[in-house]
Swiss-Prot record:
Record-level GO cellular component terms: membrane
Keywords: Membrane, Transmembrane, Transmembrane helix, Transport
Segments traversing the membrane: 38-58, 62-82, 110-130, 154-174, 215-235, 265-285, 319-339, 393-413, 421-441, 467-487, 506-526, 567-587, 608-628, 643-663
Name of the protein described by the UniProt record: Probable metal-nicotianamine transporter YSL8
Keyword check for Lipid metabolism: no
Location(s) in or outside the cell: Membrane
Disulfide links within the chain: none
Predominant location category: membrane
Organism: Oryza sativa subsp. japonica (Rice)
Gene Ontology molecular function: any one: oligopeptide transmembrane transporter activity
Keyword Transmembrane set for record: yes
Annotated function: May be involved in the transport of nicotianamine-chelated metals.
Tissue-wise expression: Expressed in root epidermis and exoderm.
Gene of this entry: YSL8
Amino acid sequence: MMAAAAGEGEAEVTREVISVSTEKAFEGKALPAWSEQITVRSLVVSAVLGTFLSFIVMKLNLTSGIVPSLNVSAGLLAFFLMKTWTSALERCGVFPKPFTRQENTVVQTCVISCSSIAFSGGFGTYILGMSKKIAEGFDEAEAKTSINVEEPSLGRLIAFLFLVSFVGLFSIVPLRKIMIISYKLTYPSGSATAHLINSFHTPQGAIQAKHQVSILFKSFVGSFLWSLFQWFYAAGPGCGFSSFPTFGMVAYSRRFYFDFSATYVGVGMICPYIINFSLLIGSVVSWGIMWPYIESKKGSWYDAGLPKSSLHGLNGYQVFISIAMIVGDGLFNFFSIVLRTAYDLYLKRRGGASKQPQETPFAGATGTERQVLSFDDRRRTQVFLKDQIPTTIAAAAYVLLAAISVVAIPHIFRQLRPKHVVWAYVVAPLFAFCNAYGTGLTDWSLSSSYGKLAIFIFGANIGAKDGGVVAGLAACGLMMGIVSTASDLVQDFKTGYLTLTSPRSMFVSQVLGTGMGCIISPMVFWMFYKANNIGMEEGFPAPYAKIYRGIALLGVNGWDQLPRYCLRFCLAFFLLAIAICALKEVAKQRGWWIQDFIPSALGMAVPFFLGSFFTIDMCVGSLVLFLWSRSDPVRAHTFAPAVASGLICGDGIWSLPSSILSLANVNPPMCMRVFSTATNDKVQLFLRTLPTPP
């Protein structure tokens, strides 16, 4: 989801044709050696920002599972902190080395690789899906046995992440020149980040960046103070502004309300309009139409006495219909990108054999039509090929890490056998290449789709009696860890290519950032896990953890346990998701005007299970951006990302002091609740029966 929302938004940046040479502006500046691009100050700033953003990503991951791209936030904050560092030293009479765009790129890479572990590490998906808290929401006795439940452990989490997160880096290194130089893949998010960094280090761009940082800081402070204010009124479940029935009590019971979350207002400002529109459509279809209808069949389609969490009741429809849409969307995009990748590679090979340039359907996406290298391309290619990363070392490192994992991972998750890990590491490089190539074409990472595929295959192969639920989820983590980091690395190579940053320094910064993330993210998760109601509607619902466990249960048990007509609904919405994706793809290829108005099937699926409260927040964010763009398009384009980032960061970082207060048993002093008139009358009658306090 993260890649989906971020990719559609950031791709717009790279569609602009830049006619002025970027590298001519930097021609007089000396290019630092790769070892000089990685400095102590860059690592310190990376660790601080990585921790900061990890809290934000973790909170988003555990609430809705929708995490937008934070590249703009990371870029602005890295530039601001590094400039502040150097300016402070200069005022003290110490003149450090100049802050270059190469060092800026290293910080950006390190920060994003660190904070992305909070997402790809599975804390809101497969790791939490193994836990007893999530398993208790499913009434399958077989899935609650000890063999199918694994409680998170801080030491095991860190060890597992170290084992799986580095392998993907080495699997894709030998193909970096093919991806960046030969195929000239665009990697829209990486290119957008590079253009942002390049602009910071021009005189005009530096001035604009200072204004953006100022706006971001003001937005951050306002968001943080608003979260602090809300905390005082949230003493219990259903208390505070986050439970305010904005549209009335009936709508509130259907999860239609505005919960005053600055985070999701900011997310709504960053995500494309069509994503927010898709969420709203999904909310109306599910909570406005479908669930009330199915609930009216209580006692006929399913037992009326079942608890809310039972998969044999309404919850079963909610979970598995949303899974059907997510899987349908994922499978379509998976096969679409695999076929596009294979066809594009075939045309390139045929074109190379005939020595004639071939026009491909995706030439606009890959940029293969360039025949004469510009000054910028020649300069960037020269730098990119200068500092090599030996292929033999990368291959040896992959084999060594794979061998260690084959021995160690079965000790971390006893449900996985060494042969399962071997098979995963055999096919992972192929999937890593497909995902990295597809991301370069479309800016859409399918790492979660490969993970879901692993859940089905390994879960079904092992079976419920031998721990197939946990084994499938662990295999999902293994596959996602390899595939996700591989595509992230090539994306960063593209950023380095466009900023004349050495690929060797980029690789080292990615390794260092990943190492930081493997320690920081589990510790951040552990604080959330111990201090909050993870998996509960009041707190952090972690919807994708339930969905991933539901997928694992389907893998080991099949469809037999579903309530009446649920399979038919699942099939219908599975086909609907494929039809929507197909229509969107055809409209895009043919240039139909309706392409921008076709909703995202994945976006529609998320509120099917979670509800509509965050959807309203995101639509408010879209409305704010729309009105701002209509009244002042230039300032909106320049400063809206900074305002949105500040809203996200301020509310997100409040989770740190909030968790500390919770661990210290410091609770909010007041509870603000809204009752209907009838309920209020009952409350008043009850209060009159209580003795008057002295």
